[in-house]
């Protein structure tokens, strides 16, 4: 473990890789050298990052299979991203988590639709009651007995001398 974290060891490995590449490739103008160097750098970085991480994870984890599977999937996804692919490899656990999240969201939306539908039905019933109260109904005879200002008014038969006292009479003004 000390060797993996030692800076001198890392620098010696990089120097060894550079010396090996320069000995293999004698022509300094070779076109593929940057690509080969970047691939080797990525592989070396993955090697340096994944091995200690996997060792620690396997020691501390209860389920080593899931840890190894997760590390391998992460490495494959990293390589796919470096290669320019937009697709990713997923495990069944991730798919199940996404399905659970989708089902939970659908249930939440269905509950909201149910609440909204109930509110809309209540609003429609309220509007119907308001409409029914506002509709004018044709009435043949108007019942004036309920009018409070009609109590003391006498009918034509009850008036003295049969004359309406409220009817205006002719008034002559003097000049």
From Swiss-Prot:
It holds the Pfam family Rota_NSP4. Ca(2+) binds at residues 120, 123. It is found in: Host rough endoplasmic reticulum membrane; Host membrane, Host caveola; Secreted. Glycans are attached at residues 8, 18. Residues 52-175 are cytoplasmic. Plays an essential role in the virus replication cycle by acting as a viroporin. Creates a pore in the host endoplasmic reticulum and as a consequence releases Ca(2+) in the cytoplasm of infected cell. In turn, high levels of cytoplasmic calcium trigger membrane trafficking and transport of viral ER-associated proteins to viroplasms, sites of viral genome replication and immature particle assembly. The secreted form acts as an enterotoxin that causes phospholipase C-dependent elevation of the intracellular calcium concentration in host intestinal mucosa cells. Increased concentration of intracellular calcium disrupts the cytoskeleton and the tight junctions, raising the paracellular permeability. Potentiates chloride ion secretion through a calcium ion-dependent signaling pathway, inducing age-dependent diarrhea. Binds 1 calcium ion per tetramer. This is Non-structural glycoprotein 4. It comes from Rotavirus A (strain RVA/Human/United States/D/1974/G1P1A[8]).
